Amino acid sequence: MMWKTQPRSKSSNNIAYYREGSGTSILFIHGVGLRLESWNAQLKYLKDHFDVIAIDLPGHGESDHQTSSNKNIDSYTRMIKSFTDEIIQKKFIITGHSLGALIAIDYAIKYKNDCNGIVALNCVFQRSDGEMKALKKRLNNIASVNHEKEIDATTKRWFGDNNSEYG
């Protein structure tokens, strides 16, 4: 699947993002190994009714890598807090998929006064040791992965072969 690459701006902490529309703000956070284009279908339909903001997590898409070797949910949450304080500057709905869902939940708990609502999609819970090992391997290989091929495989797994309407 080919997706439409969205134009990006960058925050002062080098998080790449796409923003369009007006009204209530919705922040979209993707999962491991993906990029903001994984939200293209949602952005396409919601931008006419909302202020949609999708980010590339640090180390993904066009965002810079985290400088800290301590890459965990808390460090991502703190970076996103800095981003929302600078870029959104008002209450918003936070939406995340997979890793993004974990970050969204952590953000909503820590900064509940920033959020009008939360959507957590495909959030993981109690991974086995084998699943954690596979996830860590995937995280360590992100820099060398062909992201388009990775997104194609993920999209095919979710939606089947005929998924052109989702990009």
Regions found by a protein language model. Give the residues of each.
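Serine-hydrolase catalytic-loop signature spanning alpha/beta hydrolases and amidase-signature enzymes
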Residues: 31-41, 52
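Conserved alpha/beta-hydrolase catalytic His-Asp/Glu region
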Residues: 126-134, 144-167
